[in-house]
Amino acid sequence: MDIKRAVLENLKRRSKEEIKGFIQEVVDSKNENAIPGLGVIFEAAWEKMTEEEKDSMMNLIMRGIS
């Protein structure tokens, strides 16, 4: 099983709060090994966003990296 599918399968069984906790834990720990998992989550969300949501997300990203 590839990493992308493994991450998505694991997250499907989790609640919104559990996923939020996972994201916060990765951010707080600065564990670079978990970065691919965040990328999978981002890609899954991005693929389902409208153009308006993508524009809004890009504003948040730009604010975060500036």
Curated annotation (Swiss-Prot):
Q: Where is the signal peptide?
A: none
Swiss-Prot/TrEMBL keywords: Sporulation
Q: Does the record's keyword annotation contain Ligase?
A: no
Subcellular localization, as worded in the UniProt entry: Spore core
Fetch the Pfam families from UniProt.
SSPI
Q: Which InterPro entries match?
A: SspI
Induction remark: Expressed only in the forespore compartment of sporulating cells.
Coiled coil regions, renumbered to chain: none
Superkingdom of the organism of origin: Bacteria
Which BP terms from GO are recorded?
asexual sporulation; sporulation resulting in formation of a cellular spore
Q: Which family does it belong to?
A: Belongs to the SspI family.
Q: Which NCBIfam families match?
A: SASP_sspI
Q: What is this protein called?
A: Small, acid-soluble spore protein I
Source species of the chain: Caldanaerobacter subterraneus subsp. tengcongensis (strain DSM 15242 / JCM 11007 / NBRC 100824 / MB4) (Thermoanaerobacter tengcongensis)
Instruction: List the taxonomic lineage.
Output: Bacteria, Bacillati, Bacillota, Clostridia, Thermoanaerobacterales
